[in-house]
UniProtKB/Swiss-Prot annotation:
One of its GO terms (molecular function) is phospho-N-acetylmuramoyl-pentapeptide-transferase activity. It comes from the Bacteria. It is found in: Cell inner membrane. One of its GO terms (cellular component) is plasma membrane. This is Phospho-N-acetylmuramoyl-pentapeptide-transferase. InterPro entries: Glycosyl_transferase_4, PNAcMuramoyl-5peptid_Trfase, PNAcMuramoyl-5peptid_Trfase_CS. Belongs to the glycosyltransferase 4 family. MraY subfamily. It is an enzyme of class 2 (transferase). Catalyzes the initial step of the lipid cycle reactions in the biosynthesis of the cell wall peptidoglycan: transfers peptidoglycan precursor phospho-MurNAc-pentapeptide from UDP-MurNAc-pentapeptide onto the lipid carrier undecaprenyl phosphate, yielding undecaprenyl-pyrophosphoryl-MurNAc-pentapeptide, known as lipid I. The chain crosses the membrane at residues 26-46, 73-93, 98-118, 136-156, 168-188, 199-219, 235-255, 263-283, 288-308, 338-358. One of its GO terms (biological process) is peptidoglycan biosynthetic process. PANTHER family: PHOSPHO-N-ACETYLMURAMOYL-PENTAPEPTIDE-TRANSFERASE (PTHR22926), PHOSPHO-N-ACETYLMURAMOYL-PENTAPEPTIDE-TRANSFERASE HOMOLOG (PTHR22926:SF5). It catalyses: UDP-N-acetyl-alpha-D-muramoyl-L-alanyl-gamma-D-glutamyl-meso-2,6-diaminopimeloyl-D-alanyl-D-alanine + di-trans,octa-cis-undecaprenyl phosphate = di-trans,octa-cis-undecaprenyl diphospho-N-acetyl-alpha-D-muramoyl-L-alanyl-D-glutamyl-meso-2,6-diaminopimeloyl-D-alanyl-D-alanine + UMP.
């Protein structure tokens, strides 16, 4: 909104021309989202406490988690407000990608919010039925994927792009819709599985969003895209502002979510943030890079799949508990050690992902 106002005012004062620069608006987007999260955080937490919106803890989880019972949850709503306001203020609202990523994020946030609300109403850790939640996620992702496919103006927008090799671009046709839906839903649930310790999910989300912002900026600028040998996707540069909003909102939330957490994001935040990363990766045609940079999310998801499959086939568990972070907790690692080491791994993976911009 302010971006469009600035473009009108530019006719009266040339200084407003600075708002045309994506980098400038991204900085404003980060600061706006960060400021909103920090300012309204205490009020949101206080209201959650007042209405007894407390975390339900599984009885079969690590004993150290029992003390987390009652900690305010659904703090992810704070993140979504900060992201939405910041994006609406500083992004170009005539850009289709901006609306796709924003609506997907809010749709998955709504699904997560209903799930959280049911858990609170029933006073247990079971919310929406798994089949119902998954179906709603698929519908939301399918709608976004179909829209992107139908509005694509260049074949590369619906092709599979493999990193490291310039020429490896494979047209997917209708397969794009299936791949995009899988990435969005998979990313959403992967972040949700990772959200089990204080600050564990939010910092990797911030780091991956930062990495995707670099790809979005390069892909949206045809000169940079040609130089780096990555697909040039007109319009995706505006997603840098959205990614910046995720970074700002995430850091603001981490202020209250760091160990020991004053608030948890809940499914309303985790499902939404995961979907946001997934849909941005789809838009910039970097699904495989997301798989690499978000390796922690992948590890957590795979650990659950291995655990379930092993138990069903052999009756034995590979890990002491899944997802993976609980395994290390039960091995005796203090919670902060698990969190920070997972953060460090994510930093390394994001750097590897960014290195693929040059290694081609």
């Amino acid at each position: 909104m302010l971006y469009h106002l600035a473009m009108v005012l530019e006719t009266f004062y040339s200084g407003f021309n600075v708002f045309q620069y994506i980098t400038f608006r991204t900085i404003l987007g980060v600061l706006t989202a960060l400021g909103i999260a920090l300012m309204i955080g205490p009020a949101v937490i206080q209201r959650l406490v007042l209405h007894q919106v407390g975390q339900q803890v599984r009885d079969d989880g690590p004993e150290t988690h029992l003390e987390k019972a009652g900690t305010p949850t659904m703090g992810g709503a704070l993140i979504l407000v900060a992201i939405a306001v910041s994006t609406l203020l500083w992004a170009d609202l005539t850009n289709r990608y901006v609306w796709v990523v924003l609506l997907v994020t809010l749709a998955f946030g709504l699904i997560g919010g209903v799930d959280d609300a049911l858990k609170l109403a029933r006073q247990d850790s079971q919310g929406l039925r798994a089949r119902t939640k998954f179906s709603l996620q698929v519908l939301a992702a399918l709608a976004a994927s179909t829209f992107l496919f139908a509005t694509a103006t260049d074949p590369v927008e619906t092709s599979l792009v493999l990193p490291l090799v310039k020429e490896w671009v494979f047209p997917l046709g209708l397969g794009f819709i299936a791949l995009a839906t899988l990435v969005i839903v998979g990313s959403s649930n992967a972040v949700n599985l990772t959200d089990g310790l204080d600050g564990l999910a939010i910092m990797p989300t911030v780091l991956v969003a930062t990495g995707l912002a670099v790809f979005a900026y390069a892909s949206g600028h045809h000169v940079f895209a040609d130089y780096l040998g990555i697909p040039s996707v007109p319009g995706v540069g505006e997603l840098v502002i959205f990614c910046g909003a995720i970074v700002g909102a995430g850091l603001g939330f981490l202020w209250y979510n760091t160990y020991p957490a004053q608030v948890f994001m809940g499914d309303v935040g985790a499902l939404a943030l995961g979907a946001a990363l997934g849909v941005v990766a789809v838009a910039v045609r970097q699904e495989i890079v997301l798989f690499i940079m978000g390796g922690i999310f992948v590890m957590e998801t795979v650990s659950v799949m291995i655990q379930v499959l092993s138990y069903k086939l052999t009756g034995r568990r590979v890990f002491r508990m899944a997802p993976l972070h609980h395994h290390y907790e039960l091995k005796g690692w203090p919670e902060p050690r698990v969190i920070v080491r997972f953060w460090i791994i994510t930093v390394v993976l994001v750097l590897i992902g960014l290195a693929m911009l040059k290694v081609r």
